[in-house]
């Protein structure tokens, strides 16, 4: 017994110096990193708070515990330190509208790469949007561009009109009942159905037909957005989640099954497209011209290299398009519709413009996109809605791997991530009078060129949003469906601007997290 006690004591005693040594090594290493970041790092000369330069934990704390609040801390940094700040150990933020086009440049100007952590955190590295390398990104994006061009979207206009008509029919189900419905859920369902019709030839899976407008679909994306700060800073977590069997994940979070079902459907469609190509059934692709019926048919018949034709990579492409196309478009629609309904003068003028068009057309149906493009007040409303919903509020870091950038006499070393937020561009008081106010009239008549310069809801450059044409068409058609003489008479119910104003600046922005959403009732037109 005494020997056992002595042995245990010896082991415990001998282990203490080792533990202390490991702690000392860890502290020394950590202090060395902090010293390097503060005094020897290539960005040490740039202004900003020391704590942000020393550790990434400062940013993580704001985004995780502050619900995406780091953007507003960066705004405070700019107010204190000036138009360029070091926002974390390796990255710079610039707040200067004139410099935007020097960060977000076209592909023929110079190589531009993305920040790897953006793709790592979402596990979609193989999609074109998350591809880091400049040349590989261009190679993967190029075949997609004609599909989402103005002409490409026009090919799908009848599909879009059909989905929007389904939305109108669903709203009429609530007409005169006094029942409250979630319009933000309906918009997410609509956007999801539109992407589905473009990717998949025929499907029985529709979100709008669900009695609650596929509430779980909306809530799934909402949860993922809130989780992004964790995934982006600790990307191994999302990889672990991917390993969880579907049967277990379905029990833990039944909503996730909807995305799995959509992903499985995409994979099946990709395999069909590859089979059609192999048998010669689909050989209609010409460079820059859309003839294939679905996105996948188009891609498998494009000039993508074989290495980029795998089912896994094409499925990743579809998943990113579905996520981005659902969330950002639906939120922009919600923001726009609420702001119109809150302003009787705006709603009246918009309805009058639609009434004139409908009288000219002589029928109670959705106008063509080309007709909606000619309505100045509608387009002013759409533009103002996109400005205030921002698209992405989060900075979008870009890396110039070969060329140093110069800003206000400071040389930004090659390889430095530099980001600029659309929020800063859109809220610039020197460019927009009362920038937080919804004022469509600001886009009518002679528009200050600086307003167009600062208008970046889809970003710019070689990595700009792929589908602004689709977004404009969708939103314009929805507005026509809701504010024409024959439209369902929707009215807000216990909903105000705070239910749509983006105040949580995650990678994709959200309104206040305690919001009960965009609630409306549908009155009878004579009420």
From Swiss-Prot:
Q: Where are the transmembrane segments?
A: 15-35
Q: Give compartment(s).
A: Membrane
Check the record and name the InterPro entries matching this protein.
Answer: Cyt_P450, Cyt_P450_CS, Cyt_P450_E_grp-I, Cyt_P450_sf, Cytochrome_P450_monoxygenase
What does the UniProt keyword field contain?
Glycoprotein, Heme, Iron, Membrane, Metal-binding, Monooxygenase, Oxidoreductase, Transmembrane, Transmembrane helix
> How does the protein associate with the membrane?
Single-pass membrane protein
Domain of life where this protein originates: Eukaryota
**UniProt GO molecular function:** heme binding; iron ion binding; monooxygenase activity; oxidoreductase activity, acting on paired donors, with incorporation or reduction of molecular oxygen
**CDD domains cross-referenced by the UniProt entry:** CYP58-like (cd11062)
Q: What does this protein do?
A: Cytochrome P450 monooxygenase; part of the gene cluster that mediates the biosynthesis of the diterpene glucoside brassicicene C. In the first step of the brassicicene C biosynthesis, the bifunctional diterpene synthase bsc8 that possesses both prenyl transferase and terpene cyclase activity, converts isopentenyl diphosphate and dimethylallyl diphosphate into geranylgeranyl diphosphate (GGDP) that is further converted into fusicocca-2,10(14)-diene, the first precursor for brassicicene C.
| Protein name (database record) | Fusicoccadiene C-8 hydroxylase
Protein's organism = Alternaria brassicicola (Dark leaf spot agent)
Which lineage is the organism of this entry classified under, starting from the top rank? Eukaryota, Fungi, Dikarya, Ascomycota, Pezizomycotina
